[in-house]
């Protein structure tokens, strides 16, 4: 009798772990935003900042992400942008918000002659307003739309 129960339970456990396990390693849109765009430790004047950060934040795996922006403020400051000026996103959606003030950012752009796996980025330190798309409950940034 015990063997019959274990033969029934084993396939059920396999099914449950098959459903649960993939979701455990999947990051949310908000977590992805934080990984790709937040660096509150402050900007670096190093010309290799973008090369280091793009690699460290897994944006050079399989291909070189062409453009990325890092914001050098605490996450709470960037989350607060979601309650600031509502603007239209580049894709036409209406869930974008523009910061009231310019923020310290680093703009990373793939150099023209750079090819995977040797991703080489131009690092530019700037002070600009940011535009982010926000979603969810709590309402948080999920996409970096632009800097202006």
UniProtKB/Swiss-Prot annotation:
Q: In which tissues is it expressed?
A: Pancreas.
Any S-S bridges, and between which cysteines? Answer: 50-108, 64-119, 82-134, 89-96
Q: Enumerate the InterPro entries for this protein.
A: RNaseA, RNaseA-like_dom_sf, RNaseA_AS, RNaseA_domain
Q: Which domain of life is it from?
A: Eukaryota
Q: Which residues form a coiled coil?
A: none
Q: Does the keyword Coiled coil apply?
A: no
For this record, the Gene Ontology CC terms, alphabetical, are: extracellular region
Binding of substrate occurs at: 32, 35, 65-69, 90, 109
Q: Name one GO biological process term.
A: defense response to Gram-positive bacterium
Is the keyword Secreted assigned to this protein? yes
Protein keywords = Disulfide bond, Endonuclease, Glycoprotein, Hydrolase, Lyase, Nuclease, Secreted, Signal
Question: Which positions make up the signal peptide?
Answer: 1-25
**Active-site residues?**
37, 143
Molecular function terms, GO-annotated: lyase activity; nucleic acid binding; ribonuclease A activity
Subcellular localization is given as: Secreted
What EC number is given for this enzyme? 4.6.1.18
Provide the primary localization: secreted
* Pfam families given in the database record: RnaseA
Q: Which residues are glycosylated?
A: 58, 86
Enumerate the catalysed reactions: an [RNA] containing cytidine + H2O = an [RNA]-3'-cytidine-3'-phosphate + a 5'-hydroxy-ribonucleotide-3'-[RNA]; an [RNA] containing uridine + H2O = an [RNA]-3'-uridine-3'-phosphate + a 5'-hydroxy-ribonucleotide-3'-[RNA]
Q: What function does this protein fulfil?
A: Endonuclease that catalyzes the cleavage of RNA on the 3' side of pyrimidine nucleotides. Acts on single-stranded and double-stranded RNA.
| Family of this protein | Belongs to the pancreatic ribonuclease family.
Assembly description: Monomer. Interacts with and forms tight 1:1 complexes with RNH1. Dimerization of two such complexes may occur. Interaction with RNH1 inhibits this protein.
Q: Which PANTHER family match?
A: RIBONUCLEASE, RIBONUCLEASE PANCREATIC
Entry protein name: Ribonuclease pancreatic
Q: Which organism does this record belong to?
A: Myodes glareolus (Bank vole)
Q: Which gene encodes it?
A: RNASE1
